[in-house]
Amino acid sequence: MSGPAAPLRVAHQFVTAGSRALLALGPRYLPFADAASPGLPLPRLLRLSLFQLVVGMAAALLVGTLNRVMIVELGVAAWVVSLFVGLPLLFAPFRTLVGFRSDHHRSHLGWRRVPYIWLGTMLQFGGLAIMPFALFILAGDTTLPAPLGAVVGPLAAGLAFLLVGAGMQTTQTAGLALATDLADEEARPRVVALMYVTLLVGMVGSGLVFSWLLADFTPTRLIQVVQGAAVVTIVLNLVALWKQEARDAGRRPRAGEVAPRFGAAWHSFIADRRARRFLWAVGLGTAAFTMQDIVLEPYGGEILHLSVGATSALTALLAGGGLLAFGVAARLLSRGANAERVAAWGACVGLPGFSAVIFAAPLEAAWLFRLGAFLIGFGAGLFSVGTLTAAMGLERKEHVGLALGAWG
């Protein structure tokens, strides 16, 4: 075995063997065994889901670890950190456009989804590669003249966060659409739900790993961790994409063909009153649950005096609550519960979670803070699963990427 493809073949064989070992356990021990289908067997499905692990890793790094490190260890102003952490969200509205373009993409290679997933991978890799150095310049740890550093630092840090955010959004939108394309129609909701759970697993696992690696914080260790995450991004996404989407000669450009217009497709999608109400609910609910992202870890560090490792573990608590919520939601939905009602229950669970975080400071109770973080994750999980299931109900065959982009 030699050549540049050899490492990919080794990784592919390793992941496939592990997937088959899990498959041998039987459906009783694999709650997502029913997500597999003849067109997308479980080993291939689990390998494809690796792109969600990468997105979860980046989310844990940006929203969790780097958020606190910039404020507490590097001394960056909280409002500046809030601005940078919020930059990836600027690309979120374009997820719908990315999904639409991947629905109708034509290329000489005959792929629709893979070019967008690879584009997102390279954007995320580039952002992570330059991020630690940009943060040190932003914090003033540089030999550049002060006036120049004051300009270069914010620009470089902003570019790094924007690249990572754009990469995450692009990869996830096209990846979910590819999973939906490959799965049989009756298995699609379970496949996309599995992808969401994989995202949370990535957040839990990477949150714990970052907590362990940065227990004794040093600038050199931060560079190693962030750039290591960049390498992991490339490797896992390559393994995830390897031989997933078949090349189709019918997707090559045709002379004189008029490309579909995004505006017409969007107006057709939102013509349904239910779709409009759904988008409002998703927007407001997501804003409610994500407002805490930029302040939760610095709050634990500055107010409750928790270490970098302890606050990094909060990401694992949030994602762990989300994983539990998915199990509860799956049970409720399998018994015929209304998806929108499940999402509403998630919003209600979030209320005591935020209250616990607020009262943890005057009571000086770190355990109450952790409990609040877990409840926020649980509520967000119910909300996400409920709205995801509702989004699958809004989906049309020709608008798979558009519908998933709108949900994202």
Regions inferred by a protein language model and the residue ranges of each:
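Intracellular loop-helix junctions on the cytosolic face of multi-pass helical membrane proteins
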Residues: 1-42, 147-160, 170-176, 182-291, ...
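Short amphipathic helix-loop junctions that connect adjacent transmembrane helices
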Residues: 64-80, 294-311
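Juxtamembrane helix-start elements in MFS-like secondary transporters
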Residues: 77-85, 153, 192, 306-315
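Cytoplasmic loop-to-transmembrane helix junctions
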Residues: 80, 187-194, 310, 399-406
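Helix-to-loop junctions at the C-terminal end of transmembrane segments
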Residues: 93-110, 214, 324-341
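C-terminal ends and interior cores of transmembrane alpha-helices
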Residues: 117-150, 348-364
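Intracellular juxtamembrane helix-capping segments at the cytosolic ends
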Residues: 170-183, 382-396
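C-terminal transmembrane helical hairpin of 12-TM major facilitator-type secondary transporters
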Residues: 342-386
